Amino acid sequence: MELKAQATSILKEAILKVGFEVEDSELQFETSSHADLASRVAFRLASIHKQNPKELASRIVSAIEIPEGSYIGEVSAAGPYINFLAGRHYMDETVTAVREEKEKFGCGAPKDRILLEHTSANPNGPLHVGHIRNSIIGDTLARILRRAGYDVEVQYYVNDMGRQIAVVSWACERFELDLSRKSDAAIADVYIKANVELDKNPDYVKKIDALMEKVEVGDLQTIERFDKAVSLAIAGIKETLLRLNVVHDKFVNESRFLKSGEVHDIVERIKATGRTETDKGALVVDLSDYGFEKTLVIQRSNGTSLYTTRDLAYHEWKAGQADRIIDVFGADHKLISGQLRATLNAIGIKEPEVVIFEFVSLPEGSMSTRRGQFISADDLFDRVTEAAFEQVESRRPETSTEFKKQVAEMVGIGAVRYDIVRVSPEKSTVFNWKEALDFEKQGAPYIQYSHARACSILEKAKDEAAWDPAEEITPSLLVEDSEIDLIKKMAMFDSIIDLGARELKPHVLAIYARELADSFNQFYRFVPVIAAEDEKVRASRLALVDCARIVLANSLDTLGIGAPESM
């Protein structure tokens, strides 16, 4: 990022010299195959001032002065583009910074407090692959934001009182729970049976309605039944998330906002705006001036609240906890999240930033907990790690079973996380576990293997070349094209973190990690390291391998993926 800051300063000064003035945002920097940074500012200025963009770019470049010790090595005009190339000082400083900062490399200065909510699946059964896209996007975003310097708290909003939970509670009383199974799977078994019963006997629906009304008025026995069922499901969900390397700082129950009176208060505040009306006995909010034709129901005709109402109260509470609020929702929440933001805006409450993701599926088809037509995340993890174990066994038959299991778990879970997060959230995707585990496909196993390869090279160097990691080196000896490419790729890490944090796009880090692994493998393929004849060159190249190891490990850690030292 410092390279861009210096380019910004130099370019703005040159533009002033030729008689114009621009804001930083108008410099329009982008990456280019021809330069480390390229600016399109000549296009913008030429269109405003009716000049030739090529000629203007040349005039600006002629006015540029590169100060002593700058990270900028060279500036040139290529048609209307102004291209910046990093200088030697930039490369040397990057190597030094990685070696000194290690796992802190790429960390930003302290910033605001963020409250990020993700996953928040209904506690009516195990998580399936559709849920875990939410978990993986949310967890990776939290990791990126933390590395960027934000103080992040991650929350799971527990639906502990909606209709589905009433069905779960009723099911737990009506059918025997098989507690020899994982608790969320046992809940799913009875939930599925209950839905079959409800479809056959519509009269049972009245019992569900009665349970919901009892919870709403605070009936302690019914609340206790709900709590017991929810706790069982959440315990199983937490196990699954832990295996996926996803951790929430806080689980917040929906019912607390009803008990505290905050739901009642927010309904009254919405009424005070004059936006509410009655529709068949239900209280609805008119949001037509926000572009929503459909009204938002906030109270049923029987006076009970809805999930949406309680969610509004939750968001009001969240707004007082942090500077920024971020929600990760599936595409099916696009309408309701828009209505929620509009309603909060109408009553003067800070709106959340919403990350909407499209759905992920398996080649086998769609998933639904209600009908039991789903493959649980647990089953998926088991399948993937079994397949990973077979790969480790074929590649490293001499290792212990314990080693194979550890690596298989790291590689299998890493493959799931990477394959899901590498796709931009707004695009739907199909998770193919066979492709995700393919070492040649440049997914997580490829990146993990690159890290393990770097570790292996360094271990070998300690034995064969008496390499000392603390030894002073001369980064300026790293002059081969593949060395320079690798250094420049490592130097991009902090700007990638910044981009992912600014745009809430975790996939940019996944793509970067793969490109970094590519750069490292290209370097090792074309340049002798341990076999380098000159001792100083050898030491510098081994230091570069160590730098690559550090930045690969930092990238994997920020993606929530393990970085094995051996595979």
From Swiss-Prot:
Keywords: Aminoacyl-tRNA synthetase, ATP-binding, Cytoplasm, Ligase, Nucleotide-binding, Protein biosynthesis. Transmembrane segments: none annotated. SMART domains: Arg_tRNA_synt_N, DALR_1. One of its GO terms (biological process) is arginyl-tRNA aminoacylation. The keyword Nucleotide-binding applies. Pfam families: Arg_tRNA_synt_N (PF03485), DALR_1 (PF05746), tRNA-synt_1d (PF00750). It comes from the Archaea. Gene3D superfamilies: Arginyl tRNA synthetase N-terminal domain (3.30.1360.70), HUPs (3.40.50.620), Isoleucyl-tRNA Synthetase, Domain 1 (1.10.730.10). It is an enzyme of class 6 (ligase). It catalyses: tRNA(Arg) + L-arginine + ATP = L-arginyl-tRNA(Arg) + AMP + diphosphate. PROSITE patterns: AA_TRNA_LIGASE_I. A motif ('HIGH' region) lies at residues 121-131. One of its GO terms (molecular function) is ATP binding. It is found in: Cytoplasm. InterPro entries: aa-tRNA-synth_I_CS, Arg-tRNA-ligase, Arg-tRNA-synth_N, Arg-tRNA-synth_N_sf, ArgRS_core, DALR_anticod-bd, Rossmann-like_a/b/a_fold, tRNAsynth_Ia_anticodon-bd. Its EC number is 6.1.1.19. One of its GO terms (cellular component) is cytoplasm. Its main location: cytoplasm. HAMAP family: Arg_tRNA_synth. PANTHER family: ARGININE--TRNA LIGASE, CYTOPLASMIC, ARGINYL-TRNA SYNTHETASE. Belongs to the class-I aminoacyl-tRNA synthetase family. This is Arginine--tRNA ligase. It comes from Methanosarcina acetivorans (strain ATCC 35395 / DSM 2834 / JCM 12185 / C2A). The gene is argS.
